[in-house]
């Protein structure tokens, strides 16, 4: 999918929260470690898994319930129980090298936790972080 220039994101998980929520506000699961990023759903965009497109916010920390609009800088290629579940990376400014590394490291650890949850829920299929793609910069 071609990434858009900007995305309007409804925040469902505040940065440092342990609770992963569904778009309707119900609890999906409690993580063994906190989210390093605010996380939510993109308004008006459906993902391949049938849910609203996921997005994480890098560079600031909007709280659960807020709606924020930021440029899209890239995406995390993620597979959850055999289904593509990519996450757009948004924020007020282009992520630094350290932030890019944090995003990839976090989602590799997150994949490990999700694999265990999938096993517990009786789901099969691969769960993995397949890497991070940076949106090409536009020379101005």
Question: Model-derived features: where do they sit?
Answer:
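Hydrophobic N-terminal alpha-helices or hydrophobic patches in metabolic proteins across all domains
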Residues: 1-140
């Amino acid at each position: 999918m071609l990434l858009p220039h900007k995305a309007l994101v409804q925040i469902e998980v505040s940065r440092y929260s342990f609770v992963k929520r569904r778009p309707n506000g119900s609890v999906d699961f409690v993580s063994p470690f906190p989210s390093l990023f605010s996380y939510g759903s993109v308004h008006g965009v459906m993902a391949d898994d049938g849910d609203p497109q996921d997005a994480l916010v890098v560079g600031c920390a909007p709280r659960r319930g807020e709606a924020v609009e930021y440029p899209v800088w890239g995406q995390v290629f993620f597979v959850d129980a055999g289904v593509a579940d990519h996450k757009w990376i948004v924020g007020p400014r282009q992520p630094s090298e350290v932030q890019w590394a944090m995003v990839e490291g976090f989602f590799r650890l997150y994949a490990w936790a999700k694999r265990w949850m999938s096993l517990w829920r009786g789901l099969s299929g691969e769960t993995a972080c397949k890497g991070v793609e940076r949106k090409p910069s536009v020379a101005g």
